[in-house]
A protein has these predicted regions:
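Intein/HINT protein-splicing elements and their conserved insertion hotspots or analogous self-processing inserts
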Residues: 1-86, 96-155
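Short hydrophobic/aromatic beta-strand micro-patches
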Residues: 91-95
Length: 155
């Protein structure tokens, strides 16, 4: 919570630490190699809003839906796994034909297959059997393009 004078209580207030920058650099170089090889269709980092926002922006940009299961993405709480902005995380879309090549190119780095892209028109996120998010891509697009109505009603 942020109080009126800007003092932070609770979540936040600490600069993220990168304990092994050389590992992150090697991972980014491996990702760059797979991109240059034409293996990756698209990639998005999780630095501005975490996994959930990266997935939403990818669905909006491609006008595609996705079915994602975050089970296996860590032992932290769901909110941290969805919206955590920890360093060195990104979402990558590859065709099924290139999945093995991508995983081989990223060998030695933590990689989790989250789900599939589809034309269902919605982003669906689960944590195992627990549904977390089910939102239409068109609704996300309108919210992203639109403005907030701060008047409390129509003008």
């Amino acid at each position: 919570m942020m109080t009126e004078n800007g003092q932070v209580d609770g979540i936040g207030g600490q600069v993220p630490q990168l304990p092994h920058p050389e590992q992150n650099l090697a991972m980014y170089r491996a990702l760059s190699t797979t991109i240059r090889a034409g293996i990756v269709r698209t990639a998005h980092d999780c630095s501005e809003g975490g996994l959930a926002v990266a997935l939403a922006e990818m669905c909006i940009g491609g006008r595609m839906g996705a079915s994602v299961d975050i089970d296996g993405t860590g032992s932290g709480d769901v909110w941290g796994r969805l919206w955590g902005e920890s360093l060195g995380r990104f979402v990558v879309a590859v065709s099924q034909d290139h999945e093995s090549a991508f995983l081989a190119g990223m060998k030695g780095f933590p990689t989790t297959v989250l789900g599939t892209v589809d034309d269902a028109g919605s982003l669906r996120i689960t944590d195992g059997d627990d549904p977390l998010v089910n939102v239409e891509v068109e609704a996300m697009t309108e919210a992203w393009k639109g403005t907030l109505d701060m008047t409390g009603g129509t003008i």
